[in-house]
Each structure stands twice: as structure tokens, then as C-alpha cells.
């Protein structure tokens, strides 16, 4: 058996990247080999799940090359890994280097529970790369996307991944609001040195909702120096926002520049297949029985926000459990309230409103015309689409005649600047917003 396992390791070492081999393959051991079935012992449940999902085929193929006949592989968890069954937030950190703010990590937000689809594949790949090799390729990693699309899940998955490798990893996961509040409290208590040491001595800093740093000059100043200290020390920084750095109003140029140094990746709305997969995985983890037609019905009703999608599933399961009624589409339909999203404000409604207000046609808006009035109306429409829908920049460009996403980005930035300088633009935006929201309520 040892000869077989050594041969498999030799084959895989030549095929896999060093970080992948060191992280996943090397910690595993061969437990038993009988009747052409190799039992592999893994250090924790997360490793077992990951190996089963991603490397079982490669291990079996390598084993066949070693002994000249097909083999099967199966995975078990080490008996000494009971500690790994506990959520990371319950683990007792090593006294030599206690993690920072580990208690704020949600034990459910792991890579194994993240559903990958076309809408988030790039972000998932980037997050996994950062988790495997922090401080190397994508630093900082900037995740942007609408509310409830998985940014926080991916951020915290990175944290859990690092802690699974080394529980001594010092991690700070914090919202921008909390960072600002802690800064204010540190100033009040004359404890700035403690505050700075807390955030500048971590191995991994993850800061959520960075868009709320807008206009907070002193917070931006302090975060700028924290960013620099960590970056220059080779520590990983992960940032999440509902928009790209260029679209955060009143953000210092030097911060915007640093946020753009690494990789900016956008998470878009999930398609119907991904939404169904999310519900199926949720039902599986929560031991819920939900028929496929019910899954499809809920996934069709909730299209823009994963939190509301999962909330609808929980509400449906609770209802049939309490009422004793069967789990059918007819049973749950009345208790599924309409999603509280901006989905009722459609791209067509925005386009129609702008055309009516500025007296241009939809054909003109989708054309390549650079006439001043048409160009301004088009830019305004792009801005409103970004604000009132969850369309990505490329999707907004497609809605307006196939414009490039950089054109959309420029338009949104220009309107942002105009509304600051020009009260008339600000009043126009307010008027259009009021009409859109009023129409959506009827």
C-alpha cells in the first residue's frame, strides 16, 4: 500500500501546482487498500469534501498508472480531527498568536457551501487562489456586486480556509462601519497605538462594505496607512463593495488607486440554474425535503438576492411543517411574499422614463449617436440602471445598444461628478428617482 501511495504522490506532484499539492494532497495518508479500493485518511471534514469533489478522479487515475489496473478511492476523516468538526469560531486559538476578530466569521460561509455558477465563477476562482496563496497574485482582491450575491460568503470562506490550514493565522474580518466606529473610540480613549497594532499585525484583513467609507476623511486616512502597512509586509487584503472603486463617491484618489492594484471581480445575479442549485444545497445541508417543482417555483420568483431566495425556502418549509400540509407549489405560493427588491423597477421602465423626461427616442438611446442631448440622456440612463437595478456593467451596456462596460463606467462616473457640481442635475435625478419608486409601488 505504501508503494502505491508513494507512486500516486509522485504522479500528482508533477501534475498539480505546488500550493495545491501541499495544501490538499500532502496532508492526506493512505489508510487501507483492499479489492482495488484505496481508503484515504484526511485531516478534517472540509479536506475530505474538497478531495472527493475535486481530486478523486486524479488520484484514481494516478493509482491506475502505478499498478496497471483501475482503482476506486474513498475518503475518511482522521479520528483525531474531532476538533475540526467544530465551527472555526469555537476553536481555541493558539496562545502564541491569537487570531483577530475570528469570532465574527460565520461557520456556514465556507467554500464547500458556496454554489458556483456563471455569475460568480471568476470571483470564486480568485478567492480560492487568494486562500491558497495569500499576498501573492491578487492583492488586494476587490469583490463587487449587488446586495445578497455572495461577496461576504466568499470573503469569510477565505478566512475559514486559512484557519483550516493554520489555526494560528491572525485574521481581521470587519465591516467598514465597525472599523470607523472602532477608530472613533480609539481616538476618544487615546488608544490609537492599540488600534493600529490590532489591524496592522494581522495576516489577512477582510473589510466589507467599503463603499460606506465615502466622505469619511479621517477613516480613509487611517485605512490608507493600514493598507500600506499590510501590503508592504506581504499580507493579504480582501475588500467587498456594492460598486467598483471608481464609482465610490468622495473616495480619495490614492485609495481608489490602491484598491485597483490587484484584481477587481464582479459578482452578478445568478441564473435560474444557479438559483436552483443554491436552494438544493441549502435543503441538503438543513435536511429539508423539497420537491424539484417547488425548488423551481421559488427560484423563479426570487431572482436578484440570494439571502431572500434562501429565506423564501426556509419560510416555505416552516409553513408546511407547522400546518401539516404537503409540500407543493399550490401550498407554498400564498405565503411567498413578493421579493423586497428593486426588481420591480425594470430596465425598460427606466429607459421609457428617461426618454419621456428628456424627449429622446429609445432608438436614439441605443444608437451610436454622439449628439449632446442623446449622449447626456444615455449617460443618465446608465446611471439610473446601475442605481435601481442589479444589472452588471456589461448588461447595462447591452441594454443600451451594446455599449462597452468601460463606456458605462465613464457615464456613471460623469453623472456622479455632475450631481455634485450641478444642483440642476441633482434635482433631475431626485425627480426621476421619485417617479420610478412611485410607479413601482403601483
Curated annotation (Swiss-Prot):
Subunit structure: Oligomerizes as a right-handed, spiral filament on DNA at oriC.
One Pfam family here: Bac_DnaA_C
Swiss-Prot/TrEMBL keywords: ATP-binding, Cytoplasm, DNA replication, DNA-binding, Lipid-binding, Nucleotide-binding
Superkingdom classification of source: Bacteria
Region listing for Domain II, in residue ranges: 69-103
Functional summary from the UniProt entry: Plays an essential role in the initiation and regulation of chromosomal replication. ATP-DnaA binds to the origin of replication (oriC) to initiate formation of the DNA replication initiation complex once per cell cycle. Binds the DnaA box (a 9 base pair repeat at the origin) and separates the double-stranded (ds)DNA. Forms a right-handed helical filament on oriC DNA; dsDNA binds to the exterior of the filament while single-stranded (ss)DNA is stabiized in the filament's interior.
BP GO annotations: DNA replication; DNA replication initiation; regulation of DNA replication
Protein name: Chromosomal replication initiator protein DnaA
Gene Ontology terms for molecular function: ATP binding; ATP hydrolysis activity; DNA replication origin binding; lipid binding
Notes concerning its domains: Domain I is involved in oligomerization and binding regulators, domain II is flexibile and of varying length in different bacteria, domain III forms the AAA+ region, while domain IV binds dsDNA.
Matching HAMAP family: DnaA_bact (MF_00377)
Region (Domain I, interacts with DnaA modulators): 1-69
Region (Domain III, AAA+ region): 104-320
Upper classification of the organism: Bacteria, Bacillati, Cyanobacteriota, Cyanophyceae, Gloeobacterales
Cellular localization per UniProt: Cytoplasm
Membership in a protein family: Belongs to the DnaA family.
CDD domains in the record: AAA, Bac_DnaA_C
One GO cellular component term: plasma membrane
Region (Domain IV, binds dsDNA): 321-442
Entries under InterPro entries matching the protein: AAA+_ATPase, Chromosome_initiator_DnaA, Chromosome_initiator_DnaA-like, Chromosome_initiator_DnaA_CS, DnaA_C, DnaA_dom, DnaA_N_dom, DnaA_N_sf
Residues annotated to bind ATP: 148, 150-152
Amino acid at each position: 500500500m505504501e508503494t502505491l501511495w508513494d507512486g500516486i504522490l509522485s504522479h500528482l506532484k508533477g501534475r498539480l501546482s505546488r500550493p495545491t499539492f501541499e495544501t490538499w494532497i500532502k496532508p492526506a495518508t493512505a489508510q487501507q487498500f483492499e479489492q482495488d479500493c484505496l481508503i484515504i485518511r484526511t485531516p478534517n471534514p472540509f479536506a475530505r469534501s474538497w478531495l472527493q469533489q475535486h481530486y478523486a478522479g486524479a488520484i484514481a487515475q494516478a493509482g491506475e498508472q502505478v499498478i496497471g489496473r483501475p482503482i476506486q478511492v474513498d475518503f475518511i476523516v482522521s479520528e483525531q480531527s474531532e476538533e475540526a468538526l467544530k465551527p472555526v469560531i469555537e476553536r481555541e486559538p493558539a496562545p502564541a498568536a491569537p487570531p483577530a476578530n475570528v469570532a465574527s466569521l460565520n461557520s456556514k460561509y465556507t467554500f464547500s457551501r458556496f454554489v458556483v455558477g456563471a455569475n460568480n465563477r471568476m470571483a470564486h476562482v480568485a478567492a480560492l487562489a487568494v486562500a491558497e496563496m495569500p499576498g501573492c497574485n491578487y492583492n488586494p482582491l476587490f469583490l463587487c456586486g449587488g446586495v445578497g450575491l455572495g461577496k461576504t460568503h466568499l470573503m469569510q470562506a477565505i478566512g475559514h480556509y486559512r484557519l483550516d490550514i493554520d489555526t494560528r493565522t491572525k485574521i481581521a474580518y470587519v465591516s467598514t462601519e465597525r472599523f470607523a466606529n472602532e477608530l472613533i473610540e480609539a481616538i476618544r480613549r487615546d488608544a490609537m497605538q492599540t488600534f493600529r497594532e490590532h489591524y496592522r499585525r494581522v495576516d489577512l484583513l477582510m473589510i466589507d462594505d467599503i463603499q460606506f467609507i465615502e466622505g469619511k476623511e479621517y477613516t480613509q486616512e487611517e485605512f490608507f496607512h493600514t493598507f500600506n502597512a499590510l501590503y508592504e509586509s506581504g499580507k493579504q487584503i480582501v475588500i467587498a463593495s456594492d460598486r467598483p472603486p471608481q464609482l465610490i463617491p468622495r473616495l480619495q484618489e490614492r485609495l481608489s488607486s490602491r484598491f485597483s492594484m490587484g484584481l477587481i471581480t464582479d459578482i452578478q445575479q445568478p441564473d435560474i440554474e444557479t438559483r436552483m442549485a443554491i436552494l438544493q444545497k441549502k435543503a441538503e445541508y438543513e435536511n429539508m425535503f423539497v420537491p424539484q417543482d417547488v425548488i423551481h417555483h421559488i427560484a423563479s420568483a426570487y431572482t436578484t438576492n440570494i439571502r431572500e431566495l434562501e429565506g423564501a425556502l426556509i419560510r416555505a418549509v416552516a409553513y408546511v411543517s407547522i400546518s401539516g400540509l404537503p409540500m407543493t407549489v399550490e401550498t407554498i405560493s400564498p405565503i411567498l411574499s413578493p421579493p423586497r427588491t428593486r426588481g420591480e423597477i425594470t430596465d425598460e421602465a427606466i429607459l421609457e422614463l428617461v426618454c419621456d423626461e428628456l424627449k429622446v427616442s429609445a432608438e436614439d438611446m441605443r444608437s451610436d449617436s454622439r449628439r449632446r442631448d442623446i449622449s447626456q440622456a444615455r449617460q443618465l440612463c446608465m446611471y439610473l440602471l446601475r442605481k435601481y437595478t442589479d444589472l452588471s456593467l456589461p448588461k447595462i451596456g447591452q441594454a443600451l445598444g451594446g455599449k462597452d462596460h468601460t463606456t458605462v463606467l465613464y457615464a456613471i462616473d460623469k453623472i456622479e461628478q455632475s450631481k455634485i457640481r450641478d444642483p440642476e442635475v441633482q434635482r433631475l435625478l431626485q425627480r426621476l428617482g421619485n417617479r420610478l419608486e412611485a410607479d413601482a409601488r403601483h
